[in-house]
Amino acid sequence: MSCVARARTTPPEMTTTKKQGCQRPQRVAFLLGWWGLLAAATAVIWLTDIAQDYKNVSLQIALVLALGGLSTWILRSSGLPSPHRWWAAALIWTPVWVISPMGPVKLINNGNTGVADWRWRWAPAHDETLTRTVAAPTVQLAWKETDRDYPRFLGNGYWAEVKGVDLEADWNAHQPKLLWKQPVGAGWSGFAIVGDYAVTQEQRGDQEMVVCYELKTGKVVWSHADEARWDPAGPGALGGVGPRATPTIHDGHVYTHGATGILNCIDARSGKLLWSHDTLAEFGAENISWGKSDSPLIVDDNVVISVGGLNNNSLVAFNRETGDVAWAAGSHRSSYASPILTEIAGVRQILAVNENFLTAHAAATGVVLWEHPWDGDSNGNASASQPVPVGGDRIFLSKGYGIQSQLIQVTRTATNGEEAGTDDADKWSAEIIWSKPVLRTKFGNVVLRDGVVYGIDDIDMDCAELETGKRNWKKRRRPELGHGQIILVGEKILALSESGELVLIAADSKKYRELAKLQAIEGVTWNNPALSGQYLLVRNAEEAACFELPLAPLPSIQ
């Protein structure tokens, strides 16, 4: 019977109630339709080949809009008495308030803006519970360099690779041995290893620290502290607190770059501070959302960092013995990548991935030689991956946020025999060979073997041909690698996942082959591992560990 027909036979005193009963299904249908529309839009986004963080954000927005639709329906169309409507709407938004900046719960995010953990907002952060300072050693340490050192960010090359060792593939028969595991301060710094010692950077309360450990025992032997703490609000808070860069150990000195721009030179044997610069203050540069992250680069007698100033002081070189400024050049904001030294067209130059350009500087003078546009925003779709020279004056570029990787060709013409960049006759150009949606690294970097590039594309292991950019395979495992880090060791890739799992993968261009795995540490892990011979150091913002990995005999040379 229709609503009209029922109304004709309904007593007047019941008309209002019956009409409401007829209208209510339409109101429910509107709410269900709104939810269905949001679900469909979210599904389309998740089925599209875009960055995982965009997918997660779309889901969060959809949930907020769904709650908004439900609360609007309760207030306007539910038929509940007025006090009950307001209480019900408030109850719906209570979980949102709980995790808001005003609520009692602080969420710990992973690299895709997903939720990895939580803690009570009033509880002290992990780094605030640790010992702040460590006394310097009473005797100077004996630092002995070896051919297995891992002395800086990514070791000794353009990508993380350890040569001269091979790893056992069967970790059931040959288990990695845990030598030590202990709490460390916050931050995303990696370890630099020389001889029997390893150095990293940590945040402990209000002190940004440089800490030296015994490699095989984890014993702290010296530390240096600066009164600094990078703990940004807003979107920057997603990156957490503490230093990001990895120390550089060179010629008995430890060079460090803190998240607030403090550049230190420290005596490796004693932990004594030799010289220091507060670079952002001295050069009038502003920090970037997630803090200064580039690791110091040694170039001859200088140590070079990206200051990010806009007035001919984007890249700055300091005399590594005295700390005096040697030169400053460039006018771009920093990214989160580190400068590298290479040679292109017979000219030594420093490559710096800036906010939205790849810039090449003459190694001796800092003069800008050439630039190549590279889409980025250091407060948004930031660049954090290294430029990779691959031979033939070509450079491989990659980053996250859905930006395509590129292989570019650099050419120098009209050479006059003088140092490049000192005469107008020197002309440089950079042209794109290919640009494809492969190997879209975000926090990590790629490795290269036999003309094949391996890396983590968003959250999946990826493999592509260097010459063409053609993808050979892409693999999503469970649990996912997330925004982890990788090291090439012979014919194997050692991956440290975002959740702290150690995964051994064959460097096979034909298919993904997982050889072994081990849960190494717990918590969000963006730090690069360091491998010295069989000794692997891993860490995150809460704990560090050293494993002795089983070695396999090196293949014989015929």
Regions found by a protein language model. Name each.
Residues 403-405, 500, 524-558:
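Blade-level signature of beta-propeller repeat domains, shared across WD40, Kelch, NHL, RCC1
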Residues 82-107:
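Internal/C-terminal transmembrane anchor helices
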Residues 173, 179-192, 204-207, 223-248, ...:
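Extracytoplasmic beta-rich repeat domains
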Residues 121-183, 209-236, 272-281, 285, ...:
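Aromatic (tryptophan-biased) beta-strands that constitute blades/sheets of beta-rich domains
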Residues 403-405, 436-507:
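Loop/turn-rich, solvent-exposed surfaces of beta-rich toroidal or solenoidal domains
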Residues 30-79:
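Membrane-embedded alpha-helical segments of integral membrane proteins
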